């Protein structure tokens, strides 16, 4: 019984560590993207630019990033739909296999 409890405890810990690693990787990726965004912004801004010109650059960049987010949302929805279809097909195949035996 103790071995089973230890196995469960270790498995839960492993899963928690996996989630924490993924979360940390996401944070690293997000911060790298922020650094890249700021570097891109610095490439566009010149000392002689007006505040309006700088705001226009920022608004254009914001629009581009919003479009990318929308594209990723669409791709995610398509992948989720395909995953549901595959899950349904696997379930149907398992039922057919059980009925065949």
Swiss-Prot record:
Keywords: Coiled coil, Cytoplasm. Pfam families: DUF496 (PF04363). Its main location: cytoplasm. InterPro entries: DUF496. GO terms for cellular component: cytosol. It comes from the Bacteria. It is found in: Cytoplasm. Residues 14-43, 76-96 form a coiled coil. The keyword Coiled coil applies. Pole-localizer protein involved in the regulation of several cellular processes. Belongs to the pole-localizer TmaR family. This is Pole-localizer protein TmaR.
């Amino acid at each position: 019984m103790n071995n089973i409890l230890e196995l469960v405890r270790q498995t839960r810990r492993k899963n928690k560590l996996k989630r924490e690693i993924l979360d940390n990787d996401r944070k690293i990726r997000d911060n790298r993207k922020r650094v890249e965004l700021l570097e891109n912004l610095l490439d566009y801004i010149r000392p002689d630019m007006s505040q309006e010109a700088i705001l226009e650059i920022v608004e254009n960049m914001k629009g581009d990033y919003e479009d990318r987010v929308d594209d990723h949302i669409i791709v995610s929805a398509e992948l989720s739909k395909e995953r549901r279809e595959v899950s349904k097909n696997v379930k149907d195949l398992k039922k057919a296999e059980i009925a065949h035996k």
